[in-house]
Curated annotation (Swiss-Prot):
Coiled coil: none annotated. It comes from Drosophila melanogaster. GO terms for molecular function: chromatin DNA binding; double-stranded DNA binding; nucleosomal DNA binding; structural constituent of chromatin. This is Histone H1. The lineage of its organism: Eukaryota, Metazoa, Ecdysozoa, Arthropoda, Hexapoda. Phosphorylated in oocytes during prophase I of meiosis. The gene is His1. Residues 45-119 form the H15 domain.
Length: 256
């Protein structure tokens, strides 16, 4: 009995630690939610004071410069924030910007005068000009890279072409040698054929030349009697004339 009583008395003592742990977890959850809410509230819904002041001066476009009141009014109207709470930050920025050269103070002293943007600040504030400059630089860089790549590729192609040309020359030379060999073989064959063919006409020519002298000799023999016949005629004429002349001599002798 005493043991059961001790067990029952011990059980209620062990229960409180679980409830304590639950409370601690709830507190941590509530604490994390509170910190998240604080962080959400701490993040501003407007850009920093530097950007707001520069934008207000740029968009107001006042010849004599924009005053502190005009800047505050512009900030409250466009960004919908309390410019009175931001006034110390605005004044601090105006003073530092005048010292740095981002702003030019046309009137007054400190943060109570009128302010204009400097030429360097105007150039910095033009996003279009920045983008144009960046795009131009990128184009120049891309052109340089492209020209380098083209130069490398042209060198590679030139080397490849130089490597290919000797091979082509070798192939052409081998083709030419093969063709020359073929032509030489064909010429040799033709020479053999022509030798065989030419020998036959030579033999025929020899026969013709051998036959021609006989004809010439025959012609000469035929012509010789004609030549020999002519002198005979002349001799006869001479004899006739002699015989004719002889009686005349006789007559002259008779006259004596």
């Amino acid at each position: 009995m005493s043991d059961s009583a001790v067990a029952t008395s011990a059980s209620p003592v062990a229960a409180p630690p679980a409830t304590v742990e639950k409370k601690v977890v709830q507190k941590k959850a509530s604490g994390s939610a509170g910190t998240k809410a604080k962080k959400a509230s701490a993040t501003p819904s407007h850009p920093p004071t530097q950007q707001m002041v520069d934008a207000s001066i740029k968009n107001l476009k006042e010849r004599g410069g924009s005053s502190l009141l005009a800047i505050k009014k512009y900030i409250t109207a466009t960004y919908k924030c309390d410019a009175q709470k931001l006034a110390p930050f605005i004044k601090k920025y105006l003073k530092s910007a005048v010292v740095n050269g981002k702003l030019i103070q046309t009137k007054g002293k400190g943060a109570s005068g009128s302010f204009k943007l400097s030429a360097s600040a105007k150039k910095e504030k033009d996003p279009k000009a920045k983008s144009k400059v960046l795009s131009a630089e990128k184009k120049v860089q891309s052109k340089k890279v492209a020209s380098k790549k083209i130069g490398v590729s042209s060198k590679k192609t030139a080397v490849g072409a130089a490597d290919k040309k000797p091979k082509a020359k070798k192939a052409v030379a081998t083709k030419k040698t093969a063709e020359n060999k073929k032509t030489e073989k064909a010429k040799a064959k033709d020479a053999k054929k022509t030798g065989i063919i030419k020998s036959k006409p030579a033999a025929t020519k020899a026969k013709v030349t051998a036959a021609k002298p006989k004809a010439v000799v025959a012609k000469a023999s035929k012509a010789k009697p004609a030549v020999s016949a002519k002198p005979k005629k002349t001799v006869k004429k001479a004899s006739v004339s002699a015989t004719a002349k002889k009686p005349k001599a006789k007559t002259t002798a008779a006259k004596k």
